[in-house]
């Protein structure tokens, strides 16, 4: 859309019933109708955050044209144009057969359905280019070949390398280790932290592939990063820009602030949104007005929060416990004046264990 094209976002209401064998070592479990419908609805909602399907493009569901097809019509109108030898030669099929892993007719037929999608999108929306991950190359070329045979159309495909794990396997919900666009599956903070952990050698590639930063801007970021890699400026830029794209600028800012605090920064400047994000990540304990007015025993609070096993532990190792980043004063009670932004106080034990004391009348976002 940024380059003047009209994107068509294809939802697999039909192909989701089958399961794509590409990049898989074994058969996918079939989804029930309720799960599939929920997935399609979630994808529609998530895509709408990135593409204005009304003014910029369209969101289409392949069940609209595949659902009404009968088996006989599909075999007659589509199957007769497809060579079985070419289907067997696809990497997704050949790799399974070579390993004697086997493949059901259901998964074997998947490439025909996706190929047919390309034909239908060209007929109905004049779609000439299909863009996907590199694991979809075989399915895309199947569609290009089918469109040429059925309609004499010259279509094209563009793929990008997949982001893979250290073992070379792709990320995905069915293979484990996925990060989600949905905030209720992967929180903005967890999303931000994921990109902060990217190895130095991968940062430049990720910035180029996943952000809208210019090549010059990325080059400048990497130059600074290489001079002081311990400051992780490359990861910070990557985490900020991707979190902003997915969750918005405010969430990216709050995630960055929360991250700094959890990993050793001072919490004094935390604002309400950042505190709310922290509360959802590290846990919180609610306290009412009366408790705050009367004052709370700090040692008891650390036990109540789960940061200490007993008040004796707090007294014995007081130097390791902090309130809002400062060593705890066991002779001073904690009250409303200790709430940052009038919302919460941060309790810490060591460098990595944190808990928030939240005013009970406040709503955690």
Question: What do these predicted ranges mean?
Answer:
Residues 1-136, 141-144, 151-156, 169:
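NTP-dependent nucleotidyl-transfer catalytic core
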């Amino acid at each position: 859309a940024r380059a003047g094209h009209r994107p068509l976002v294809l939802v697999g209401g039909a192909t989701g019933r089958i399961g794509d064998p590409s990049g898989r070592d074994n058969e996918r479990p079939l989804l029930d109708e309720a799960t599939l419908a929920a997935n399609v609805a979630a994808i529609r909602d998530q895509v709408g955050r990135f593409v204005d399907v009304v003014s910029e493009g369209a969101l289409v569901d392949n069940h609209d044209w595949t659902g009404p097809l009968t088996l006989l019509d599909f075999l007659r109108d589509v199957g007769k144009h497809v060579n079985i030898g070419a289907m067997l030669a696809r990497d997704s099929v050949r790799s399974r057969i070579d390993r004697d892993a086997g493949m059901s007719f259901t998964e074997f037929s998947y490439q025909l359905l996706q190929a047919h999608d390309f034909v239908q999108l060209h007929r109905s929306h004049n779609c000439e280019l299909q863009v996907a991950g590199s694991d979809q190359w075989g399915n895309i070329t199947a569609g290009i070949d089918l469109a040429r045979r059925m309609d004499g159309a010259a279509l094209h495909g563009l793929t990008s390398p997949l982001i893979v794990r250290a073992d070379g396997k792709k990320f995905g919900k069915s293979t484990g280790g996925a990060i989600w666009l949905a905030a209720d599956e992967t929180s903005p903070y967890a999303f931000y932290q994921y990109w902060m952990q990217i190895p130095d050698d991968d940062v430049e590639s990720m910035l180029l592939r996943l952000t809208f930063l210019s090549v010059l801007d990325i080059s400048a970021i990497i130059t600074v990063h290489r001079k002081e890699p311990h400051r992780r400026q490359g990861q910070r830029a990557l985490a900020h820009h991707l979190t902003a794209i997915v969750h918005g600028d405010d969430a990216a800012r709050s995630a960055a602030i929360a991250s700094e605090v959890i990993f050793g920064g001072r919490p004094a400047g935390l604002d309400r949104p950042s505190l709310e994000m922290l509360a959802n990540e590290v846990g919180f304990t609610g306290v009412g007005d009366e408790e705050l007015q009367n004052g709370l025993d700090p040692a008891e609070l650390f036990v109540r929060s789960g940061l200490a096993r007993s008040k004796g532990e707090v007294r014995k190792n007081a130097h390791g416990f902090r309130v809002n980043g400062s060593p705890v004063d066991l002779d001073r009670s904690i009250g409303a004046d200790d709430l940052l932004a009038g919302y919460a106080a941060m309790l810490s034990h060591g460098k990595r264990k944190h808990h928030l004391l939240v005013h009970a009348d406040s709503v955690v976002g």
